[in-house]
Structure formats: structure tokens, C-alpha cells
């Protein structure tokens, strides 16, 4: 096939064009080779591992839940204390579910009328981010009755008087909490009135088959074998593309045995060290007088480090509007709490914990490694505002943590500990207010007796 040059093209220009075409192969041959791929650094590996681990902790629990018999869109009412995840709140009756929704089906939730008792129905996505709460604080004009949790923009016809709640996720973890208070039987009666059902026939998600590992034994390079499946769940937080690209790059690179070994070594050195360094302040939190308070919880933005640490040490945490957590792990001398020893904690009369919570407060002691409550013959695992507390003459409140009840200490002021176990205290304020809500408050020092 011949090619005719436009008549308007001058002879000089035509000569130049032909010469350029003839020389093109030579020019291409002289093009420098592409730069080698950028090496994956130890910091890249640490960042990617910590990010991915946060998701794997959720999928691990999801697989365990379904193995234990849970089914989609079914609310399971648990007996008080009968839950199996790190740092549960033992002051509430829990109900739990996994929810699947799509463009044509919502999940309907019935909430009973609850008076003078804390309650909420919390919805989280597959990364441990809280998407919604149903309670009288979020819906003061519709605190109970019928609700429908729907995929955003889903076209679903709902019954009248149903409060629709749109969420950006197809898979949801649900926790319903009802404060036990002094009348546990009433709390359990209310708990069983919370109900859940799909509005139609949703296309149910598959339970992701990712790595299952022991809670106290973090995985190494094998975590990245699950990267493709794990990242199928969208992360709603902005700016995660770069760290997700690192995850995918490492998952591809470890096909080479030598690179796999290098990544594994890097995880066990730098990534684990970075986690250990961030743990005392729960990511980017603050520590004071032996207590740590996370900078955020429940919703994390770009702080995936804190999200992963919370998923590891206290999965399903709610937002700071609902509850604020303080973790106490050291006494006034900076030494870790030992179940063999005796300690005291005194709240001044002007800063009693009840004055900083709209609903209630509690303190729980858990093993520092397993995050499970400390076993004791009394089966007493927390102290809260429902206990038979005795106040000091000056109005202050002193609590005791010891393997046996100290002399002249009221029974309600004592939380038993387990000899030989290193532990930490978790102080919760439900409906935080005042200096707790603003972040200015920190609990008093824990004194070694």
C-alpha cells in the first residue's frame, strides 16, 4: 500500500519526515532500559503488614463465628459474659450477628423501648470501622421500633414507620448491647426483644477464607498469602491506596522463595517491633500515670495503626461518642501490674467516675497477653457503679486489686486478681462527659501496696 504525502507539505519537510521514519528503529534501539523496580523496604513491609493484619483479625473472627454456627442476618442473644473475643464488656448483655445486604434487600431491626438503661445496636464493616449505632442519642425522634439498615442507594420498599439507615458496606458485624445494671433478668428480657430479619432475599456474601491464626501468635509472611481475598473488602477510609499497593506488591513478590524469606524475617524484626513500640499508647494515643488513652477508636480515618491495635486487643470497639476506654498497665513506679501483688486506685471526691459518665463506668482486669478476664473463685470480673461501693470519709473512692481481699476493705471495692498473671485494667466510661469526653482527664495513679 502506497502512502501519499499531502501536497501542502514542502520538500524539506517531506525529506525530514522520511528520514525520521527511517531512523526510528535506531532511535528505539538506543532508548535506555527501563529503571529496575523499586525495592520493597523493611518499612514498606511493616506498614503493609500492620494494615493487612487489621483486616485479617476481622476475617479470623468472622470465620470462627460461622464455624461456631452463626448464620447471616440472624441475631444471637448471648448469656452475660458468654462471648469469646478480646476485652469484652462484662457489664452488658450482648447479642451479635453478621449481616449481608445488597441493592434489593435491607436488614430490618426491631428495637424495644428501653428506659433508664444504656443500650445500642452497633454496625461495623469488615475492617472494624463503626458505621452506625441505633439508640436514643442517634435517633431521638425514633429511639425504638422498626429500623432498616440498607446498602447506600439500594432500591427497597420498606414498611411505614421504619427508620432507614444507609451504610457503605455489604457485609456488617452487629453488636447489640444492653446494660445489665442491678436487675440482670430485666436486661436479659429486653435483650431478647431485639430482633433482626432480612427484608427480602439478599445475595449473601461468601465468608472470606483467609489465614486463621492463634490470637496470641501473630502470623509472619503467610499473612500476605491472604492479601488478595482480604482486600476484596473495600476500605471506606480515604488515602489507603498507597498502603494497599504495598500489600499487593509484597503479595506478588513473595512468589520468589528468597524474597519470601526476606519478608518473613522483616516482619519478625521490624513489623513486630513497630507494633510493640506503638502498643503502650495504643497507636497514636497518649499515656500518663500508667494509663493509656487512644487518640481515636471506633472510627479511624487514616490511622490504620490504631485500628489494627484495637482490633487485636479489643475488637468491635465503639466510637468515642459512645464509650471512652483507658488502659492501665503500670503502677506509680512504672512496673507492670502483677496478679500476685496488691494495688489501690483512689478517685478524689471531686472526680468520681460516676460524675464523668452519662450512663455508667466500669473497671475490668484482663490478662496482658490473652486479653481474657482473670479467673477467680468469686467469678467477679469487674467493678462498676452498680457494686456495693463504700466511699471514704472525704468523699473519695478507693478500689483494690489483689489476689485476696485486703483487711478492712469492703467487698464491693475489691476486684480479685490471679497470682502469677501479668494483667492490665480497662476503665470504661459509657456516655462520656466533661473532661473525659474532651480528652483532658486521666485516671489517678495505681499504687502498689
Where are the regions a protein language model picked out?
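Bacterial N-terminal signal peptides that target proteins for export
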Residues: 1-16
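Selective for proline/serine-rich intrinsically disordered segments
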Residues: 4, 23, 30-34
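C-terminal segment of classical bacterial N-terminal signal peptides
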Residues: 16-27
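A compositional/structural signature for long, glycine/proline-rich flexible linkers
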Residues: 30-449
Amino acid at each position: 500500500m502506497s502512502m501519499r504525502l499531502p501536497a501542502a507539505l514542502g520538500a524539506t519537510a517531506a525529506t525530514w519526515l522520511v528520514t525520521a521514519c527511517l531512523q526510528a528503529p535506531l532511535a528505539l534501539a538506543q532508548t535506555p532500559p527501563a529503571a529496575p523496580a523499586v525495592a520493597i523496604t523493611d518499612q514498606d513491609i511493616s506498614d503493609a503488614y500492620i494494615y493487612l493484619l487489621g483486616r485479617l483479625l476481622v476475617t479470623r473472627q468472622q470465620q470462627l463465628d460461622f464455624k461456631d454456627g452463626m448464620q447471616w442476618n440472624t441475631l444471637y442473644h448471648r448469656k452475660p459474659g458468654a462471648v469469646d473475643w478480646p476485652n469484652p464488656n462484662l457489664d452488658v448483655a450482648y447479642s451479635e450477628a453478621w449481616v449481608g445486604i445488597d441493592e434489593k434487600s435491607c436488614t430490618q431491626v426491631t428495637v424495644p423501648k428501653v428506659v433508664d438503661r444504656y443500650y445500642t445496636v452497633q454496625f461495623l464493616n469488615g475492617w472494624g470501622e463503626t458505621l452506625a449505632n441505633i439508640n436514643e442519642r442517634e435517633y431521638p425522634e425514633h429511639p425504638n421500633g422498626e429500623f432498616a439498615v440498607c446498602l447506600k442507594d439500594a432500591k427497597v420498599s420498606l414498611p411505614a414507620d421504619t427508620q432507614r439507615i444507609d451504610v457503605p458496606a455489604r457485609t456488617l458485624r452487629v453488636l447489640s448491647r444492653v446494660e445489665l445494671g442491678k436487675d440482670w433478668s430485666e436486661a436479659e428480657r429486653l435483650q431478647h426483644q431485639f430482633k433482626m430479619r432480612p427484608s427480602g432475599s439478599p445475595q449473601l456474601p461468601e465468608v472470606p477464607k483467609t489465614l486463621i491464626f492463634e490470637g496470641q501468635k501473630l502470623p509472619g509472611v503467610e499473612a500476605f498469602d491472604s492479601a488478595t481475598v482480604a482486600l476484596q473488602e473495600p476500605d471506606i477510609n480515604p488515602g489507603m491506596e498507597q498502603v494497599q499497593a504495598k500489600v499487593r506488591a509484597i503479595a506478588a513478590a513473595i512468589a520468589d522463595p528468597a524474597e519470601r524469606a526476606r519478608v518473613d524475617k522483616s516482619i519478625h524484626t521490624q513489623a513486630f517491633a513497630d507494633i510493640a513500640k506503638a502498643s503502650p499508647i495504643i497507636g497514636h494515643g497518649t499515656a500518663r500515670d500508667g494509663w493509656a488513652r487512644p487518640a481515636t477508636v471506633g472510627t479511624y480515618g487514616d490511622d490504620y495503626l490504631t485500628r489494627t491495635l484495637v482490633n487485636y486487643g479489643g475488637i468491635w470497639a465503639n466510637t468515642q461518642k459512645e464509650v471512652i476506654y483507658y488502659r492501665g498497665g503500670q503502677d506509680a513506679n512504672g512496673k507492670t501490674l502483677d496478679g500476685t501483688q496488691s494495688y489501690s486506685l483512689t478517685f478524689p471526691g471531686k472526680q468520681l467516675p460516676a460524675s464523668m459518665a452519662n450512663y455508667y463506668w466500669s473497671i475490668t482486669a484482663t490478662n496482658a497477653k490473652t486479653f481474657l478476664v482473670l479467673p477467680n473463685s468469686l467469678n467477679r470480673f469487674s467493678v462498676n457503679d452498680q457494686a456495693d461501693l463504700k466511699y471514704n470519709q472525704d468523699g473519695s473512692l478507693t478500689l483494690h486489686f489483689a489476689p485476696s481481699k485486703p483487711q478492712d476493705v469492703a467487698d464491693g471495692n475489691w476486684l480479685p486478681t490471679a497470682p502469677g498473671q501479668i494483667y492490665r485494667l480497662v476503665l470504661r466510661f459509657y456516655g462520656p462527659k466533661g473532661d473525659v469526653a474532651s480528652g483532658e482527664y486521666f485516671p489517678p495513679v495505681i499504687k502498689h501496696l
